[in-house]
Every structure is written in structure tokens, then in C-alpha cells.
Regions:
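Glycine-centered hinge/linker elements that transmit conformational signals in sensory
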Residues: 1-6, 42-72
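Extracytoplasmic/periplasmic solute-binding protein
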Residues: 1-45, 87
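Short, solvent-exposed loop/beta-turn-alpha elements that line the ligand-binding surface or hinge
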Residues: 15-16, 36-55, 102-104, 117-127, ...
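Extracytoplasmic/periplasmic substrate-recognition and gating elements
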Residues: 62-68, 103-170, 204, 224
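Short helix-initiation/N-cap motifs at beta->coil->alpha
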Residues: 70-84
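Beta->alpha turn/N-cap motifs
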Residues: 75, 92-97, 133
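Alpha-to-beta junction loops
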Residues: 84-93, 108
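Long, aromatic- and glycine/proline-rich binding clefts that accommodate carbohydrate-like moieties
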Residues: 113, 165-221, 228
Length: 253
């Protein structure tokens, strides 16, 4: 689930955020924080008429122009920009913490919080998600009842399991896990802040997202639109229309 990490040594004129050029990750996180998705409940594409997407692209573009957000060319540069002082903060899934905590010299220099809420968008929140993993029981399962019982007694029923795997770097957002003593432990790297309990709390407040088989087609189309807007100054409305039509074509509509 999405978090915002902020360095405690902000320098005047330093960008607040970093992002990989052409990647729609931050835009998607902002979109979900507003309770909006790239698809409607009936599965139709929701890009052109999305009430939050254009304002989000406008905000993103403005942040790039005024230097609030710095774009880098690839993932390695993205990670480097977080750790070498290029940027004062980062918004991403909680898994991004591992790229910071791997560097001992960063200990005590970072704080964790939720993400900013967009103004002027009904339903906007301070919470979102990016990435993660899920367990599912497929229709090919030969012992469905046994599989369901296993899931209920482990991943959906055992705080002891989550207490054990947190020490191995596996962070769950199952709400009851956040109430355990293991999750409430202070984390020295983050100045003894109980960041794991915080993250689970954030997860319980995150709006849902409508995905589906063509979700990444839609993400990629928005990423292309974003890249064209930032790099060539392309017209935003035209780019959103093209993105919508691209996804609809891929869906066979």
C-alpha cells in the first residue's frame, strides 16, 4: 500500500518527489486515492470522462515544470535519486522502503506518512496502493474446501503467521495483523516509529480500484499520454482521447 517517505534534511530548492519518466505509477496512485479507476463498474473504459484523471495530469505536469517533481530516465536512477539526496521524498508502495533501508547510512534520516490528498475532487483521500501480491483459489482446484480452510487458518486467520514473516521482510496489510505486538514494535531505522502498524492502518482506508484483464493496457495508454504531454507539450484532451480509443480497440470495442 502507498506511503510517502520524507527525508528529515530538506534543502531549499530540492525537489519533493521523484518519478520515472513515462511511468504512470504516481498518476495511478493519485487516481486511486480519489476513489477513481480507469474502468467503470460495467467494464467500460473510464479515461476521457474520468473526473480526477485530467486534474491529476495537470498537477503532475505542473510539478515537473516548477521543479517540485524530478523525472529520471530509468529504475536505477529512480532508486539513486531517493538515496543520494536528489529528492526530499517519494510516494510509492510500501515495498519501496527496502530500497532505502538497505543503506545503513540512511538510518534516522527518513519519516513515513500518508500521501497528500487532492483538492477539489469529491471522495479524495490520503491513501492509495501500488503493487503487492494476492492469494487466490483457482477454478481448477481439486480440493476447494481444503484450500479455503488453509487460507482461512493462515493468511486470513493467523496473526501468529504474520508476526513470524514480518521479521523476514514480508509485510501484510491484513487489518488484524496491524494490532499485533510485532507490528507495533518501533523500527530503529525510522527513528523508532512503528511504521508497520501505520501501513496496515493506511491500508484499511484505501479506496478500491476497478481493474480487470485490460488494466495494464489502460495503464500503458495513460503512461504514453503522460509522456507525450510532458516531453512534447501534447494537448492533454487529445492524448486522453487517444488513450481511451487505444484501450477500447485492444478490448475489441
Amino acid at each position: 500500500f502507498t506511503i510517502m517517505l520524507i527525508t528529515k534534511t530538506l534543502i531549499l530548492g530540492q525537489p519533493i518527489l521523484t518519478s520515472q519518466a513515462g511511468s504512470p505509477d504516481l498518476v495511478m496512485e493519485m487516481l486511486q486515492s480519489c476513489g477513481e479507476s480507469l474502468f467503470n463498474e460495467d467494464g467500460s473504459v473510464n479515461i476521457v470522462d474520468n473526473k480526477a484523471l485530467k486534474p491529476i495530469l495537470e498537477i503532475y505536469s505542473q510539478m515537473v515544470k516548477d521543479g517540485t517533481l524530478v523525472e529520471v530516465t530509468d529504475w536505477d536512477q529512480y532508486i539513486a535519486s531517493i538515496n543520494n539526496g536528489t529528492t526530499a521524498g517519494v510516494i510509492n508502495g510500501c515495498w519501496i522502503m527496502a530500497s532505502i533501508t538497505a543503506n545503513d547510512d540512511q538510518s534516522g534520516k527518513w519519516a513515513l506518512t500518508n500521501m497528500p490528498k487532492l483538492d477539489g475532487i469529491d471522495g479524495a483521500t490520503n491513501y492509495s496502493n501500488n503493487g503487492g501480491s494476492s492469494w487466490a483459489i483457482s477454478s481448477n482446484c481439486k480440493k476447494t474446501d481444503l484450500a479455503i480452510d488453509f487460507m482461512k487458518s493462515t493468511f486470513a486467520g493467523s496473526t501468529a503467521l504474520y508476526d513470524d514473516i514480518i521479521a523476514k521482510g514480508a509485510l501484510a496489510t491484513w487489518a488484524p495483523a496491524g494490532d499485533s505486538e510485532a507490528y507495533a514494535q518501533p523500527v530503529a531505522f525510522f527513528s523508532d516509529d512503528p511504521v508497520y502498524a501505520k501501513i496496515v492502518d493506511f491500508a484499511t482506508k484505501t479506496p478500491s480500484n476497478i481493474t480487470g484483464a485490460f488494466y495494464y493496457d489502460a495503464r500503458d495508454a495513460v503512461g504514453t499520454a503522460l509522456s507525450n504531454i510532458i516531453q512534447t507539450g501534447a494537448d492533454m484532451d487529445s492524448e486522453l482521447q487517444t488513450a481511451q480509443e487505444t484501450v477500447e480497440f485492444n478490448m475489441g470495442n
